[in-house]
Amino acid sequence: MFKRTIPLFAAFTLAISPSIFPNYAHAQEDKPKTNQYWWPKMLDLSPLRQPNATSNPMGEKFNYAEEFNSLDLNAVIEDLKKLMTTSQDWWPADYGNYGPLFIRMSWHAAGTYRIYDGRGGANGGFQRFAPQNSWPDNANLDKARRLLWPIKQKYGRKISWADLLVLAGNVAMESMGFKTIGFAGGREDAWEAININWGPEGKWLESKRQDKDGKLEKPLAATVMGLIYVNPEGPNGVPDPLAAAEKIRETFGRMAMNDEETVALIAGGHAFGKTHGAASGKYLGPAPEAAGIEEQGFGWKNSYGSGKGKDTITSGLEGAWTVTPTHWSHNYLQNLFNFNWVKTKSPGGAIQWVPENSNASSMVPDAFDPSKRHAPVMLTTDLALKFDPVYSKIAKRFLDNPKEFDDAFARAWFKLIHRDMGPRSRYLGSLVPKEAMIWQDPVPPVDYKLVDANDIANLKGKILNSGLTTSELVKTAWASASTFRGTDMRGGANGARIRLAPQKDWPANDPQELAKVLKTLESIQNNFNNAQADGKKISLADLIVLGGNAAIEQAAKQAGYDIIVPFTPGRTDATQGMTDVKSFEVLEPKADGFRNYFDKSNNMSPPEMLVEKASLLKLSVPEMTVLVGGMRVLNANTGQNQYGVFTDKPGTLNNDFFINLLSMSTEWKKSSETEGIYEGYERKTGKLKWKATSVDLIFGANSELRAVAEAYATDDAKEKFIQDFINAWVKVMTADRFDIKAANANINS
């Protein structure tokens, strides 16, 4: 959905500028400065502290899945349908139907998703909070959400804002004659804004996010600060359809859409509704977060005419694409190819396109006055579908095969609004389609009897007697499970995709060593499964995790502690056919501080990448700290490098890493031979004792991390260290087990 225009740049920038609020600007100057302000290079640990569970007014015991499953979803849908055509005086509906507005709202809630870090998307309902609620591209969506409030108020905790924002758009399409393929609930609400890197710019609608080759910096997906996708007038406001196609392909690709899905979404989405640019953006007031308190969360107050209805200003663009703005049709593609398009300007001053044929000037009905008619419009980004050779071929095929287009749009729309939800096991409700789609990273169902406690004990014995080392078993289990991303719920140990392309060949996973470990574990798996007469099996996915657990139990025993690492079977093994290789490539770790692995292509430092990895794993500061300390003494670094292995007993689970890191008997210096490496010398003898990376030393250098490291380095912390390491380990191993809750370790010392 392309709803933004360059002529409004100045207006939107002015709208949020403190200069128009003198007292506010003065208050900003007097604000206390943060530590990050004084020491901008200090490691930012805030990603590991958000969101705060105490912010949730529903309480820790609230179970949204139970509430949603008790919801009368059909009743909600009927209420939404009624709302669509019940126009309100305070914000009149175009053509008497709010459907197109709700589609835009849903699209912009979900369309922030990006593949490189899994952030964005509809989960959490973040469109309610800053900055999304005040992005220029989300102008007037505050009205759409306010229209939904009576329905949210009626059904309360049984449906989240996050689900309602998406459901409304889905119902809108159905009510206007388009057949979707379904809807899944399960998006829980966030209760506070979170800090996400949306780009480096300091002003709205700027674009300073390209590398030297003109490509977007990772992990960003949108091309402009404050837009969902691209500038609809063309790159930097230049009306060049082919240049626009390049930007569309890049940004939609980074939002998990291929060329066919991109064409389907644009052509399908623009079958509905219109753009709004009755006048210049100078008439618009501040966005919601900068508006006066009396506006009660509304923004973009419009002083032009009535400020609503026919006088609405949103993007600065003006007009509808089709002759049926509130009914599903294929008229968008028909108009796109049947007319020659000439450049013009909207009343708001935005560049757009109209048919060269003057006979088309009365094709489109007016949104409010039945006596008026208009020409259809296209945006520069629409014409990209006509002139880009790849897009054009797809669009013409859709034009000639309407049923194929309908199916493609239905599937692309479903993907758009569900892409950030993770596997189908998280889907709720009666409208979930039965088909498993490859972008959902499917895994087979458990159609066999699971192993019991005796089997687990026997299997652990076989693993430990197989010749595999503690290091190899721990590294393999970690490599399998730590692909999980709590942002879009992708990755994790379930599926055992570590044995498949592309994961089996990732440098971070030590491919040759990994192949050896997997071969041994597969032999144990086959021998066990073939020996069972009652249909009992163990998956390789389970066996990989069990191997890591067994190795940790053995390592703890060497430290004097008998432990049982909690293990719950139930993972299954995906096939290569269930795995979209390209889709999984974005999960490859370019840095993993837990394994002391770092690819120099990163644009962040190793400690920053460690925090990023821990954040994706949903770890806290103590969990990140204890895991690094444990992984080091277990000798679990990639490539068997010895950086940070501060122990003379590698393979024994103890707190040596912290004890030796904090010891004043060591003096640290930068290596003169290897960039990024530090050398620890004995102060008394000058003898080289340790080597480390910045990831290792940050736990002694950063004051907050040092405080946690000290907690694990005390004489009475040995058992606590092991307990906490096991609990954090199990959290990672079970991160993708949405069917269970992680259990805590039980130590018998």
From Swiss-Prot:
Highest taxon, organism lineage: Bacteria
A GO biological-process term: cellular response to hydrogen peroxide
Cofactor: heme b
Gene Ontology terms: cellular component: cytosol; periplasmic space
Places the protein is found: Periplasm
Cofactor note: Binds 1 heme b (iron(II)-protoporphyrin IX) group per dimer.
Positions of crosslink type Tryptophyl-tyrosyl-methioninium (Trp-Tyr) (with M-255): 107-229
Enzyme Commission number(s): 1.11.1.21
Main location: periplasm
PANTHER family reported for this sequence: CATALASE-PEROXIDASE, HYDROPEROXIDASE I, BIFUNCTIONAL CATALASE-PEROXIDASE
Family recorded in the similarity comment: Belongs to the peroxidase family. Peroxidase/catalase subfamily.
Function recorded in the entry: Bifunctional enzyme with both catalase and broad-spectrum peroxidase activity. Important for stationary phase survival.
Stated name of the protein: Catalase-peroxidase 2
Source taxonomy: Bacteria, Pseudomonadati, Pseudomonadota, Gammaproteobacteria, Legionellales
Gene: katG2
